Design a protein with these regions (language model features):
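Glycine-rich phosphate-binding loops of nucleotide-dependent enzymes
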Residues: 2-185
Length: 185
């Protein structure tokens, strides 16, 4: 396991309407590690995820990415810091292909037109690199839940994220799909 620290939080706090839901949360994640946040309902798992990914702002504390202090006030700040998130509710468009979904909103362009050939090549390279059972031209509507989750992962990885956060990634998966997802990770 690498000693390279990707994320560090120090004493992160958050309150809603005067009720403290996070108090002095310290977290360290190194390159190549996989972590699970576990706890009872209301323990603050989703809140810390939402702070790290820019959905919520913290009330106090510090966040460091690659040893550098960062201020994350929104999702754009998180993305700029190299943080990608996959929420329980997938954000794929079923009527589009795997490639179209992965590049939706940040298409590669050649003079005046989307560079479909290059986007497809990059998606195939990602599929090959991670060993996912996907085809770049396959319609998302035809994919099973595990394959859709893999498509979301590829979408996040296509941005060259340093840190990938998955919020309850197995909630809607069968036992075999969950196993396939864990093998991939």
């Amino acid at each position: 396991m690498s000693e390279e620290l990707i994320l560090r939080t120090e004493n992160v706090c958050k309150s809603f309407n005067g009720i403290q839901v996070l108090k002095n949360v310290n977290l360290e994640i190194r390159k190549g590690e996989i972590h699970a946040l576990m706890g009872e309902n209301g323990a603050g798992k989703s809140t810390i995820i939402k702070i790290i990914t820019g959905v919520y702002t913290k009330d106090d504390g510090e966040i460091y990415i690659d040893g550098q202090h960062v201020v994350i006030n929104n999702r754009h700040d998180a993305a700029e810091a190299g943080i990608s998130v996959i929420y329980q509710e997938l954000s794929l468009v079923p009527e589009l292909t795997v490639t179209e979904n992965i590049f939706l909103g940040h298409e590669l362009m050649k003079p005046g037109l989307p560079d479909k050939k290059e986007m497809r090549r990059q998606v195939q390279a990602l599929i090959d690199r991670y060993g996912f059972l996907l085809h770049p031209d396959e319609m998302v509507a035809t994919l099973g839940m595990a394959q859709r989750q893999m498509c979301e992962i590829l979408k996040a990885l296509s941005t060259e994220a340093k840190l990938l956060i998955m919020d309850e990634p197995t909630t809607s998966l069968s036992a075999s799909e969950t196993e396939q997802l864990f093998v991939t990770m």
